[in-house]
Amino acid sequence: MPSLRAHVFRVPADGPDDVAGVEALFASGLQANNIVAVLGKTEGNGCVNDFTRGYATRSFETLFSRYGVDGVSIIMSGGTEGALSPHWTVFARETVETPGERALAIGVSRTPALSPEHLGRREQILLVAEGVKSAMRDAGIDDPADAHFVQIKCPLLTSRRIAEAEAAGRTVATHDTLKSMGLSRGASALGVAVALGEIDATSINDADICTRFDLFSRCASTSSGVELTDHEIIVLGMSAKWSGPLSIDHAVMRDAIDAHSVRKARERLPENSRLAAVLAKAEPDPSGEIDGRRHTMLDDSDIAGTRHARAFVGGVLAGIFGITDLYVSGGAEHQGPPGGGPVAIIVEKEQ
């Protein structure tokens, strides 16, 4: 009985347009049409005017077009503060003549475009929830408990998008383009929570988004960008329909220094295994404290708090895993408890 098999590659990047390492994978035998997703960390500021994300996305679209490949989910997260290293994480899958044995599963989907007036509102939550369910079906994940990380690239509001909506007689959730990033991330994360049964959709209203932080998903990782108007969704989990040496588990950090939870998740994975990728969310604790001690990430007028958080949590995780090419995305609204966030660990068992 055939099964699906996943492959994960961590590739260094010298800049947002550096796809040479991925092209080298093709030269070494990776079939370009087996790639389903690319997660990237680019060296921009991670804010509204971070065009490194779009630059990197266009670079990959150009690369894939040369190989006649389309439909790859390309999700770029800006910001490599501290010692975080710019890199790409490439996900591929293929059909093999091996019975399924419960291994890493990858599913992708893309939603219809989101109208600007629906950003940061219930409509976005429900749209994302349907997209996550579609990606789970694509991955062959039947039980929401088997989903360990849901990565979403979501849109934001720009001055032009706001003006177009208001010219049509519609109102938007905010006129602050930076705030729109958080609203979009938060609504998308709540969509994940609805899809996974963590939250009942009927219990959420517009006013809860980015205010009721007791509502959150333990698996969501959302990143907003100017380069799209829809949502690109990648679901990572475990499925008996897949085979191969890759496994995934996740932790939920209760705060930015919760190394214990991350280590416990690593211990649940095969002991003699190679680290394939680490994917995480980070945000400044909105209380202004970490474990009872004051932090100043939210008071810095020069550097956005999400940038501080990426650097800080990146350092914690680098100390645990001994690598700096970590996918640490800032802004964790409704993604884990306030000040914390999910961390997914992918390993490859020895064969």
From Swiss-Prot:
Enzyme superclass (EC): hydrolase
Region (RU C): 246-351
Pfam families for the chain: Amido_AtzD_TrzD
Activity control note: Inhibited by barbituric acid.
Binding site for substrate: 53, 77-78, 185, 223-224, 310, 329-330
Keyword entries, A-Z: Hydrolase, Magnesium, Metal-binding, Plasmid
The keyword Hydrolase belongs to this UniProt entry's keyword annotation: yes
Catalytic activity reported: cyanurate + H2O = 1-carboxybiuret + H(+)
EC number(s) reported in the record: 3.5.2.15
UniProt binding sites for Mg(2+): 283, 332, 335-337, 340
RU B: region residues: 103-240
InterPro entries: AtzD/Barbiturase, AtzD/Barbiturase_RUA, AtzD/Barbiturase_RUB, AtzD/Barbiturase_RUC
Residues forming coiled coils: none
Chain positions of site Important for substrate specificity: 306
Region (RU A): 1-96
Pathway: Xenobiotic degradation; atrazine degradation; biuret from cyanurate: step 1/1
GO MF annotations in UniProt: cyanuric acid amidohydrolase activity; metal ion binding
Biological process per Gene Ontology, one example term: atrazine catabolic process
Active site residues per record: 153, 223
Similarity comment: family membership: Belongs to the cyclic amide hydrolase (CyAH) family.
Function, as annotated: Responsible for the hydrolysis of cyanuric acid, an intermediate formed during catabolism of s-triazine based compounds in herbicides such as atrazine and polymers such as melamine. Catalyzes the hydrolytic opening of the s-triazine ring of cyanuric acid (2,4,6-trihydroxy-s-triazine) to yield carbon dioxide and carboxybiuret, which spontaneously decarboxylates to biuret.
NCBIfam families: amido_AtzD_TrzD (TIGR02714)
Subunit text: Homotetramer.
Entry remark concerning the domains of this protein: The monomer structure is formed from three repeating units (RUs) that share the same structure as one another. The monomer, the active site and substrate all possess threefold rotational symmetry, to the extent that the active site possesses three potential Ser-Lys catalytic dyads. It is possible that any or all of the three active-site serines may act as nucleophile (albeit only one can do so per catalytic cycle).
Protein name as it appears in the record: Cyanuric acid amidohydrolase
